[in-house]
């Protein structure tokens, strides 16, 4: 790694420690030319698969879109933001675990419904009604009946 002070190429690692619950590494380095010390942080770059929409358009995975959809369903519901973030992280890790470069948007929708069902049944029904395009009250009733099973 280049020294940020003198831009020399030769630096050595003096100390390494895990930080952030083991998700990153903090390294103390020293330049072998100017002897200045500096800290670097190393994290794994986790690449999310691309999303294939129902009309075959491909787009990058958008975490904000996922979050806003879930928050819209959870609006005015008693679910903490920590639980929402854990659900989002669970969905992201499931998508990465597929090992695929592309995933259908339908898969993401199903994963969202799975998480919402665990978090809040009302939010699940709200999301499912839009996602599955419920046409009438009968479809709501059928979905609610499935929840009660």
Curated annotation (Swiss-Prot):
Details of cofactor binding: Binds 1 zinc ion.
A GO term, aspect molecular function: zinc ion binding
Which intervals hold the zinc fingers (unnamed)? 3-34
Read off the InterPro entries from this record: ATP-cone_dom (IPR005144), NrdR-like_N (IPR055173), RNR_NrdR-like (IPR003796)
Q: What cofactor(s) does the depicted protein rely on?
A: Zn(2+)
Keywords assigned by UniProt? ATP-binding, DNA-binding, Metal-binding, Nucleotide-binding, Repressor, Transcription, Transcription regulation, Zinc, Zinc-finger
Biological process (GO), any one: negative regulation of DNA-templated transcription
The segment(s) forming the ATP-cone domain are 49-139
Q: Which Pfam families match?
A: ATP-cone, Zn_ribbon_NrdR
Q: Which domain of life is it from?
A: Bacteria
The UniProt family comment states: Belongs to the NrdR family.
Biological role stated in the UniProt entry: Negatively regulates transcription of bacterial ribonucleotide reductase nrd genes and operons by binding to NrdR-boxes.
- What protein name does the entry list? Transcriptional repressor NrdR
List the source organism. Shigella flexneri
Upper classification of the source organism reads:
Bacteria, Pseudomonadati, Pseudomonadota, Gammaproteobacteria, Enterobacterales
């Amino acid at each position: 790694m280049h020294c940020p002070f003198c831009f020399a190429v030769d630096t050595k690692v003096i100390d390494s420690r895990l930080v952030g619950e083991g998700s990153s590494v903090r390294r103390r380095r020293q330049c072998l030319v100017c002897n200045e010390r500096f800290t670097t942080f190393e994290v794994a770059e986790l690449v999310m698969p691309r999303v294939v929409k129902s009309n075959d358009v491909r787009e990058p995975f958008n975490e904000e879109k996922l979050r806003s959809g879930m928050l819209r369903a959870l609006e005015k519901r008693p679910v903490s933001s920590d639980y929402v973030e854990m659900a989002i992280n669970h969905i992201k890790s499931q998508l990465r675990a597929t090992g695929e470069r592309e995933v259908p948007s339908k898969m993401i929708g199903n994963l969202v419904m799975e998480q919402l069902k665990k978090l809040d049944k009302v939010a699940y029904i709200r999301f499912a009604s839009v996602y599955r395009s419920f046409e009438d009250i009968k479809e709501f009733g059928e979905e609610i009946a499935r929840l009660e099973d």
